[in-house]
A protein has these predicted regions:
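Exposed, low-structure sequence patches enriched in small/polar residues
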Residues: 1-256
Length: 256
């Protein structure tokens, strides 16, 4: 599938467009329209692909282009406005022909300053990122293993991420925080991945549960979490465990 989106700001300066009727055009690739009307809005285009390997497994991927200059990309000079990202992954059910054993592998990558803008028309909402909790300027690897035997459930999740954060007290934007103005960047060239305060995150979670009521998914569960965060300026380690009784809707997003 191919998709395109636009985020606009209603309170532009006098003479700016705000919402334009052209944005209702259902035809993909209307980016030239944006240029023709001198739009200050934030647009991107993307592609998603899914390939079914067999009845029990599939590959999936996404590509997003925020801004893109082919000549600058070929020059390989770290041009700041080559803003893009990708996701690639694999999921398999009944792994190794073992019933109810599932594996999920995934990698996410986003260049610095992707999803950001020179004004508040970024890809965020209520001070949260719409695309990924790490914002931009990161690479993330995910492994999830889950298994169920009758009423016993287990789940192991491991996440490793590296990203370039901003320095505390520094007004320069290094491309991770999408709420920062990209005009406040440190340079226009030589912007490499993990630009800024390089930070490494390791997150491990193990869950063991017993389903009391399959209809409502009411279960007893034990959870153990280990989180290690290391940067150029800070290091923190967190280990905690919990016991719970709950009937839940699954939340798979703990990678922040």
């Amino acid at each position: 599938g191919i998709y395109e989106s636009v985020i606009w700001k209603n309170n532009h300066a006098l003479g700016a467009n705000g919402f334009d009727i052209n944005y209702l055009n259902p035809i993909i690739f209307f980016r030239p329209v944006e240029y023709s009307i001198n739009s200050p809005d934030n647009m991107l285009i993307g592609l998603n692909l899914k390939y079914k390997v067999n009845a029990r497994s599939f590959l999936f991927s996404q590509l997003v282009l925020d801004e893109f200059t082919l000549n600058e990309l070929k020059a390989n000079n770290g041009y700041w406005a080559n803003k893009y990202g990708y996701q690639i992954g694999y999921k398999c059910f009944d792994l190794l022909s073992i019933p109810n054993l599932t594996i999920h592998l995934e990698q996410n990558y986003t260049r610095p300053f992707t999803y950001s803008h020179w004004n508040s028309a970024n890809y965020g909402h209520y001070n949260e990122e719409l695309a990924h909790p790490l914002g931009a300027n990161f690479i993330e690897n995910i492994l999830i293993l889950s298994y169920r035997k009758k009423r016993v459930t287990t789940n192991l999740k491991y996440i490793q991420a590296s990203y370039g954060a901003d320095y505390v007290g520094d007004t320069v934007s290094y491309g991770s925080n999408i709420y920062n103005d990209y005009n406040d960047r440190s340079a226009s060239y030589g912007i490499d991945m993990f630009n800024g305060n390089k930070t490494d995150l390791k997150f491990t979670q193990f869950n063991l549960g017993y389903i009391l009521n399959p209809t409502t998914n009411l279960k007893l569960e034990f959870s153990l979490v280990n989180r290690i965060l290391k940067s150029e300026t800070n290091e923190s380690k967190t280990l905690f465990y919990s016991f719970s009784i709950r009937s839940d809707l699954f939340n798979h997003y703990y990678d922040f």
